[in-house]
Each structure stands twice: as structure tokens, then as C-alpha cells.
Amino acid sequence: MNLGGKRLAGKSQGKSRRKTPWDVEEDLTPTQEFLQTHYRERYMARHPKLIETGEAELINSFVPTHCPYCGSERFSKRGFTANGIQRYFCSCSQRFLPTTKTIFDSRKIPISEWTEYCLNLFRYVSINADSWNNKNAFSTSRYWLEKLFKTLEDYQQSTILSGMVWLDETYYPVIISQLDRKEDGSKFRGLSHNQICIGAATDKENIVCFVEGVGKPSQRKTFDAFYNHIAPGSTLVHDKETTHKKLVSSLRLKSQEYLAKDLKGLKDSENPMNPINRIHDSLKKFLNAHSGFNRDSLQNYMNLFTFVRNPPHEPLEKVAKIVNLAFENPKSLRYREQFGLNHDF
């Protein structure tokens, strides 16, 4: 399902934030020298040397259980890197580190800075704004986002809602450049294939969100999306959509149905669908912070959004969970894999 995307614009997107306009100049004015010095100091504060961050102790605390290349448990310690990270040597003749084949493999930027990046995302800061705040190239911020997507791609698999469960669909437009129009140039009305359907559900403790295709969803798509994420016998609070029938009958759900027209004009406190409506509002705000993203990556954004909204609710605890997940369920993504072929975003 190609939903359209946005291409990284030009080489300026990958320009190093470390550079100033006067790096090759010999005679600077007092103003230029002041600005250059101040800018460089702030850059270095944001980008400390790895050996100065103390992260070697963190990385070394994750002791590998097997070789990331061959899977063998026959390996031994073999000294340290210049940054103090434990090196291992396997019987297959491969050397590796605790970070090998994880999202932190071959990194040049400290995990501490990646932590700040995650905290910004949790606050709905766009990656473009984060790029400027942390003085990173835009491509670096984009690369980190793809690594985060990689880490969270299976995140929702184990989430099961129970008890009172609110479920409803919302819609998000395809990217403007990919809008399908009528022959006269006008837009299609209603829930056309220019609208991407997102199914969301919550039990007020956790949420799940899944892309269900374009236009109005079907019973099959809704069933496939939520069947493994709602406990049998739960109570489903939803609107009177026929697309929910198969899900309700298969899981033997108690159904509380409401007509959308009967809920119009109600205060939030009186609206029985308010718990899921609030999720939809937050989801739109989150997506709008990244409005030019490739819609083919929409499910990745759903995984990230649910991670942001679900427990633990303390942001630093979320970062700790991601770091642990990165080492315990390692997945890697090389920079060249992401940008070498000039992928669409």
C-alpha cells in the first residue's frame, strides 16, 4: 500500500550543524569570532566525546549471551576499545561488542544524546525541530527515528485490552502530492481512498492503534487488526458500525453501541465515546508534528505513539525501557541502508 511520501530535500538536510560560515576564514571580525566561539561551545556541550559520557559502564552491563554473527555461545572477552567498551572474540573468528547488531552499533553520538532525542519525541517535538535543538544534521535525526521504529516494530504485539474497551476509527489524509482527484481536478468527497483509516482502542490503561487501509474499513480488516488485542468476553464500547460485527461475535464481546448522530453536541463528560475520542485527538497532534512523513511509515508512527501513551508514564522510564529493549531484542540499521539509495521519507 503506497500512501505517498516526502523526499529528503537536497544536501542541505544532511549539512553538519557543527559548521559555521567562517570556518575557512583567517581574519574574523570581533562579532564573527564571538558567534563562532559561542556556537562551537554549545555544539561541543551537545556532542561530548564518548569516553567522557560514562556510557561504557552502561554498555558493558549488557553481557552478550551469544555471538551476534553465528549465534554460538563459545566466545570470550578480548580487551577493550579506546572508549572502554568490552570487546569479545568468538570461535567463528568474529570480534564483537555488546552493541554489535543493535541500534547502537557503529554509533558516533553518545547514548545520552539519543536519550534527549527520545524525550523530545515523547513531547511531540518534530524531528526537524529536534535537529536544530540538538545541532544535528536532519538526516541524523531521521536516522535515529528509523532506528527507534526498528526497535518498536513488535511493540504492540503483546498488548491485550480487557474489561471495558473503547474502539473507534479515525482518518488521516494521504500526503498532498499523492491526492487522487477527479477528472475536473476537484477532490473526492467523504471517506475516499485519500483518507487513511486508523483503528484505535483503549481500556483506559493501554491503547493500540493500527492502520486499516484507505477509505472505510471492512469487517475483515477490523477483525485482523484487533482480534489478538482484546480479551474475549470484554465489553466493547463503540459506534454502530457493521465493521465491528465479526470482532464482537468472534470474541464474544458484550456490545455497547451508540449512533454517532446521537452523541453530537454532548459535553466530553457526558459522551460515552470520550475515552477513545481523546486518544484520536492526541494521535492527530502527534502526527501533525511530523506532517510531511511518508504515509507508508504510518504504522511505525502508530507503534511509537502507543509506546508514548502506554505505561510507564514517566518519560525517563520509557527511555530506560527502550535502551533495555535495544540490547535484549537487538535489531540493527546501517546509515547506508537508510540513505544510500535516496529513499523517500
Kindly give the residue locations of the regions a language model identified.
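Residue-level recognition of single "structural anchor" positions
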Residues: M1-F345
